[in-house]
């Protein structure tokens, strides 16, 4: 769910920047993240200053903007500067004085030719960032959409003259000359159709990032949509929501965090991006998903920017430091899963108890597949819950040639001093009645 603050305009230059619940920026259409730095100040070079300085935050360079996000201890508002407003980037000159000061990048921006200084307080690739800033500014990616729309409108404006008279008012040729002319026009029409086809193909390729961006916005709206108040949801609406979730998972992540763009903050930013991404797979999996399955889903969404299992594990362990609604959990068996913080083990145990105390299951027990159908989760996750219930004394296991089955634990209800007394109350009595049906 995207969160933002009220729009700010410091000196008419800064814009409000939307961020997700984990602190990642919400990118715009066709916008791609290029570089990330930590411990960055943004100051005004003018005297008196023309805007309030921004202190100690993360600076994210994209193809369209410079996005400044405050650190956790900072109460400033996430802000951005559009690269389209930058009119000049000053060249960096090394001097003896610069060796004893924090590295700085200065640029001029409209309105009013404001001189802005980016101050590096932490350790970062200064030269790499400056080079990427020049590249993004000169690339002018924000103008590509206007150019593509203009070319598309021009490509469809041509028409072929028909009838007795041509476009210039002259009479069309007939006879053999007319046949040759007609054949030439057909070749020209075919050539034009091929050119249009290739233009459409190029346009389709150029729209790929736009489609991913659209999917990301729809994903944010879907996550922020309020749930039904009466607890009931229309079946058709629910089906459409699940179909939309599956489609968005297949589209992928608009701008995956990479080691090249994030540098030393790679695992931190990867952790934030994973926290945003995991919410839909978690909802689809019933609130809990194994780390192995999430590795598959996350790498599939990242496309060619694959991560290692160790990177995924480190990203999950960093959730303890962030205020995110998900967490990493390790069962006694060693299986690691991702689950919502709102997940309640007591509720799961209650549902398992209801399952194993039914008349049928009192006789034959339950398997992991049976529990998976009841809990609406994967069988592997259901097995972990059954093992956890066994550890808590709720269940007993039975290893047989047919596999592992779990039964309700009746031992606490049996009097060890008189094993032959049958209680008329409790689950033990119900078990006696259920098993007696087998002899009838």
From Swiss-Prot:
Residues 192-212 form a coiled coil. Residues 17-97 form the GLUE N-terminal domain. The keyword Protein transport applies. Its main location: other. Keywords: Coiled coil, Endosome, Protein transport, Transport. Residues 144-163 are annotated as: Disordered. It is found in: Endosome. One of its GO terms (molecular function) is ubiquitin binding. One of its GO terms (biological process) is multivesicular body sorting pathway. The keyword Cell division does not apply. Gene3D superfamilies: 6.10.140.260, Pleckstrin-homology domain (PH domain)/Phosphotyrosine-binding domain (PTB), Winged helix-like DNA-binding domain superfamily/Winged helix DNA-binding domain. One of its GO terms (cellular component) is late endosome. Belongs to the VPS36 family. Component of the endosomal sorting required for transport complex II (ESCRT-II), composed of VPS22, VPS25 and VPS36. Component of the ESCRT-II complex (endosomal sorting complex required for transport II), which is required for multivesicular body (MVB) formation and sorting of endosomal cargo proteins into MVBs. The ESCRT-II complex is probably involved in the recruitment of the ESCRT-III complex. This is Vacuolar protein sorting-associated protein 36. It comes from Arabidopsis thaliana (Mouse-ear cress).
């Amino acid at each position: 769910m995207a969160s933002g603050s009220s729009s700010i305009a410091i000196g008419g230059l800064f814009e409000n920047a939307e961020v997700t619940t984990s602190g990642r920026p919400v990118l715009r259409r066709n916008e791609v993240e290029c570089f990330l730095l930590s411990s960055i100040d943004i100051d005004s070079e003018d005297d008196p200053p023309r805007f309030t300085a921004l202190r100690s935050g993360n600076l994210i360079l994209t193809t369209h903007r410079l996005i400044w996000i405050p650190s956790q201890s900072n109460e400033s508002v996430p802000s951005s500067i559009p690269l389209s407003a930058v009119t000049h980037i000053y060249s960096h000159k090394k001097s003896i004085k610069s060796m004893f000061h924090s590295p700085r990048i200065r640029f001029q921006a409209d309105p009013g030719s404001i001189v802005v200084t980016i101050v590096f307080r932490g350790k970062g690739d200064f030269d790499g960032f400056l080079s990427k800033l020049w590249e993004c500014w000169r690339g002018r990616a924000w103008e590509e959409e206007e150019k593509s729309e203009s070319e598309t409108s021009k490509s469809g404006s041509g028409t072929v003259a028909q009838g007795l008279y041509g476009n210039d008012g002259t009479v069309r040729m007939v006879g053999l000359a007319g046949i040759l002319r007609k054949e030439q026009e057909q070749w020209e029409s075919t050539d034009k159709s091929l050119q249009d086809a290739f233009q459409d193909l190029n346009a389709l390729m150029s729209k790929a990032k736009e489609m991913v961006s659209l999917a990301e916005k729809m994903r944010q709206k879907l996550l922020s949509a309020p749930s039904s108040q009466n607890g009931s949801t229309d079946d058709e609406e629910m089906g459409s929501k699940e179909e939309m979730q599956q489609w968005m998972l297949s589209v992928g992540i608009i701008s995956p965090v990479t080691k090249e763009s994030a540098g030393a903050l790679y695992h931190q930013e990867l952790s934030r991006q994973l926290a945003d991404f995991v919410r839909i797979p978690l909802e689809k999996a019933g609130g809990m998903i194994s780390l192995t399955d999430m590795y598959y889903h996350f790498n599939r969404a990242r496309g060619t920017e694959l991560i290692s299992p160790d990177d995924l594990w480190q990203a999950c362990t960093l959730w303890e430091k962030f205020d995110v609604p998900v967490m990493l959990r390790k069962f006694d068996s060693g299986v690691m899963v991702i689950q919502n913080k709102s997940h309640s083990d007591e509720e799961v145990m209650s549902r398992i108890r209801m399952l194993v105390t039914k008349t049928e299951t009192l006789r034959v027990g339950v398997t992991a597949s049976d529990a998976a159908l009841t809990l609406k989760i994967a069988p592997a996750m259901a097995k972990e819950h059954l093992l956890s219930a066994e550890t808590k004394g709720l269940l007993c296991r039975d290893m047989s040639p047919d596999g592992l089955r779990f039964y309700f634990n009746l031992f606490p209800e049996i009097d060890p001093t008189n094993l032959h007394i049958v209680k008329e109350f409790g689950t033990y009595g119900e078990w006696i009645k259920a098993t007696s049906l087998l002899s009838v």
